A protein has these predicted regions:
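Positively charged n-region of N-terminal signal peptides that target proteins for export
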Residues: 1-4
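Catalytic zinc-binding patch centered on the HExxH motif and its immediate surroundings
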Residues: 24-26, 226-264
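Short pre-active-site segment immediately N-terminal to the catalytic Zn-binding motif
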Residues: 30-47, 62-63, 258-267
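Sec/Tat signal peptide C-region and signal peptidase I cleavage site
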Residues: 19-23
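Bacterial N-terminal signal peptides
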Residues: 7-17
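An active-site-proximal "capping" alpha-helix that borders the catalytic cofactor pocket
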Residues: 67-84
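Active-site recognition of the HExxH zinc-binding catalytic motif
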Residues: 47-60, 74, 78, 247
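Pan-zinc metallopeptidase signature
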Residues: 112-214
């Protein structure tokens, strides 16, 4: 896969000092902490976009899915980032795994009957699946990450088979995807409350760059619409009826707060 997205850390280090110290929930944090918060939010947003691209490809290319489509979309997103083999993409995967872990922790890792029936795996499982594929793809590069998640050496060794299966499956299905998809990118106004989230998302450039990957990397029928908007919930969607990836500004805000809650203030 092409490395199209700009070095995120460099962009955010330029953005972070420009943010007012009292900007929404970033008051009381140092410039470095603010940069870390923004990096985490953008990297999780990036993983989410690739997850929605996974749904798009499953829909438009009629990709076979055995099991939950949500798990398949996570695996496609992880595979795309692993294929880039860059420090930025590796950091994005680490942040995505941590994002699922922190999300689960914020709900006390509660997963009731309705959750099990919903089609989504538990957040902690999604985090560990990402890490398993990481260490399965490159044990020397990601051993420390897997150890930090308390994945046993025995399981780390078998993660290689998990990765090989995903690589063979996804790589084979997307081997000759073509090029030339029509893609339209739209940013809608976020409003005053979500101004910071909109600014962070726009400045990161990830929306245009993932859209460009779809444009150059696949030949899909019709026009694919990328829309960033206010949704009244922290989420992202793929709508097969309109062939549209919808990203909610509230998700950026939620991710910033999620990471900020883990940091001490005033350092």
């Amino acid at each position: 896969m092409r490395r199209l997205f700009a070095p995120i850390v460099a962009v955010l280090l330029l953005l972070a000092p420009a943010l007012p110290a009292n900007a929404q929930d970033l008051s009381g944090f140092s410039k470095q902490q603010r940069a870390d918060i923004l990096r985490f939010a953008v990297n999780n947003s990036l993983f989410t976009l690739y997850h929605e691209v996974g749904h798009l490809l499953i829909d438009k290319l009629d990709l076979p899915v055995l099991g939950r489509e949500e798990d398949a979309a996570d695996n496609i997103a992880t595979w795309i980032l692993l294929e880039k083999k860059t420090p930025d993409s590796n950091q994005a995967l680490e942040d995505a795994a941590k994002g699922w872990l922190l999300t689960g922790r914020s709900f006390d890792d509660y997963f009731g009957d309705d959750d099990y029936a919903s089609g989504y795996s538990p957040e902690r499982h999604r985090a560990l699946q990402i890490v398993c594929l990481m260490v399965g793809a490159d044990g020397s590069a990601f051993r420390k990450v897997a150890n930090a998640y308390s994945i046993s050496p025995e399981r780390q060794n078998t993660c290689h088979f998990d990765y090989e299966l995903i690589d063979r499956s996804v790589g084979g299905l997307l081997e000759k995807p073509g090029t030339g998809t029509r893609v339209k990118v739209t940013y809608e106004e976020a409003g005053e409350r979500l101004k910071l989230a909109e600014r962070v998302f726009r400045t990161s450039g990830i929306f245009e760059e993932v859209a460009e990957e779809v444009r150059r990397g696949y030949r899909l029928s019709g026009t694919v619409q990328f829309t960033a908007t206010r949704c009244d919930e922290p989420n992202a969607f793929y709508d097969p009826a309109t062939t549209e990836i919808i990203f909610c500004y509230e998700l950026v805000e939620d991710l910033m707060q999620l990471y900020a809650n883990e940091l001490p203030r005033g350092r």
